[in-house]
Amino acid sequence: MSDRPTQGLTWGPRRDFYNESGSQKIIRKLKEEPLVPIGCILTIAAFTNAYRAMRRGDHHKVQRMFRARVAAQGFTVLAMVGGGMYYAEDRNKRKELGKLKQQQEAEEKRQKWIRELEARDEEEKALQEMMDKKRKRASERTMRAETGSEGIAAQARAAFKDKANKGEAAGAEKTEAPSQRADNEKKPAGSGFLGGWFGGSSKTPETPAKDTKGKNLDSESSS
């Protein structure tokens, strides 16, 4: 039952009742009840004629115009009552359609409001997702930076340890080199001493040569 009036609102001549302007509504009323404006015009004409007769002092015409005014007013009232009775069904239908139109407008407003809320919810969800993505990227960047700094620190510590180990090894080599040189210098002296005793080659046997040279010099001088 509710679907039929809504169809009447959008299709057919009944939609004119709700899409018409003020002037169109007046014209429609005049066309539906033409006797009412005619009775109003007759009433106004009788009243103006009575006023003019009163200004001229014609009392008989004044009485006639007042009677005509009463008759015109009665005719207008009858026209209004007759028109109301004739168009009562249409007016009831219009009232029902007006209520249905109000309900339809309220429903459209509610649907529009719901759509706006859904659009806002979608925008909020999209914004929340964007913020979550940004936070996730920022956390990943911080984690990468932390891991990179830790790796650099570990490399620096390893390099420092290597340098320390190399320095210790170099210091040990420097301390060992003088002792080895001293041992090497001591070994030839001992071997020469032993060689003198055991017939080995040494520098001590060179002394007899010096003695022979001295003897030769003495013999030459004596001669």
From Swiss-Prot:
Compositional bias of type Basic and acidic residues: which residue ranges? 121-132, 159-188, 208-223
The answer to keyword Cytoplasm applying to this record is no
Q: Which PROSITE patterns match?
A: HIG1
Q: Which domain of life is it from?
A: Eukaryota
Indicate how the chain sits in the lipid bilayer: Multi-pass membrane protein
> What's the family?
Belongs to the RCF1 family.
* The protein's name in its UniProt record: Respiratory supercomplex factor 1, mitochondrial
